[in-house]
Amino acid sequence: NSKSKFIPVSNSTDQAAGIYFRFYEKKSKLEIYSEFHYNDSKVNLRDLFVDSRHSRAFSLGIQKGSINNFIFSWEWTKLEQTAGRLIRDAGSWYAHNYVYDGFTNNGEVIGASIGPGSNLQTFEIKKYSKKNTNKYLFGFQILDNDNDYYYKAFDSSNDFRRYWKDFNFYTEFEKSFKNFNLNIKCIYTKSLNYQWGLIDDNSPSYYQPGIDLDNFNITLNLIYFGF
């Protein structure tokens, strides 16, 4: 039967909207940027004004340079649903009722690498040499892993102990010389309640210790320009 080769396709579509803002002042070397998106369309203008937080996500960043080639930066990305999900569930970002794969390409998320339901704050200090041949970077990140899942998984138990949070400390060094470029990056991650897990130690106390993990990673890249 030739009809069995075809899968019915719904005419329903997914809609999204967003705006981007960037301000840069050359003299002070100050940059402010932001991106604001809706994962679902509004019913009308009244819906936009009354429930403006529904299905929203945003990024906000500030970067400030100095005369000594230092750059200070902070960025905040928030994909977690707002409290309005209790009445009007928007679903997690990068997913949709009609377009199940969401904003993806070959199974990979297009956009923030932290994934649906997560939040991230990043603090960085960079230092460049006068000729831009060397770069030194120190950074710190606070990552909330998929709070949307956490609220759904543990809502019935009201278990507020299981937030999965990562703290990343990293440093990077980059040097260019002759036809070579050397890059070394070191990252230390302290993960609290990894995958929302707790250790059952048979203690009568409600506050059980979480599954806390440590990870240290070193990446070295050497690139040759000359072929």
Model-derived features: where do they sit?
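Exposed, low-structure sequence patches enriched in small/polar residues
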Residues: N1-F227
